[in-house]
């Protein structure tokens, strides 16, 4: 009967699950877009603007956030309280990402070539928007954990 009750909780939240799945699919789309933009930025622009290290750190933070989402999914099945705790960790990462994003946009605006500046700014914004989508997924998992 416990298995039936667990499935019942998921059925009641199927709309939330579907929206979460669509949002996760959007994250994959952001990854593709960011990779395309990064491949078109000249290496000399990255070095001269001193954004290479910052960009690496920003991407690492988002990757950490994605790993946290993976941990949340795994813990939903066994310990919903742990899922909520992990989701709070993603909120901390999101705040770090926002701070780094703002600093990087200001640095990117100093790039002298307009096309390179716009491409860099779009890349940074894409990474930040992907982090926002990760936060949306995390929030959905909190709702799901509370209902289980």
Predicted regions and their residues:
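Cytosolic, long alpha-helical scaffolding segments
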Residues: 1-148
């Amino acid at each position: 009967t416990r298995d039936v009750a667990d499935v019942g909780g998921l059925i009641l939240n199927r709309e939330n699950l579907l929206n979460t799945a669509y949002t996760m699919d959007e994250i994959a789309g952001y990854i593709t877009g960011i990779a395309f933009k990064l491949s078109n930025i000249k290496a000399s622009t990255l070095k001269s603007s001193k954004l290479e290290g910052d960009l690496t750190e920003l991407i690492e933070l988002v990757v950490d956030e994605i790993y946290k989402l993976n941990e949340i999914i795994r813990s939903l099945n066994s310990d919903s309280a742990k899922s909520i705790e992990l989701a709070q960790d993603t909120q901390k990462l999101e705040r770090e990402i926002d701070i780094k994003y703002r600093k990087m946009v200001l640095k990117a605006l100093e790039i002298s070539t307009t096309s390179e500046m716009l491409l860099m700014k779009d890349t940074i914004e894409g990474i930040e928007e992907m982090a926002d989508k990760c936060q949306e997924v995390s929030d959905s998992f909190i709702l799901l954990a509370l209902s289980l």
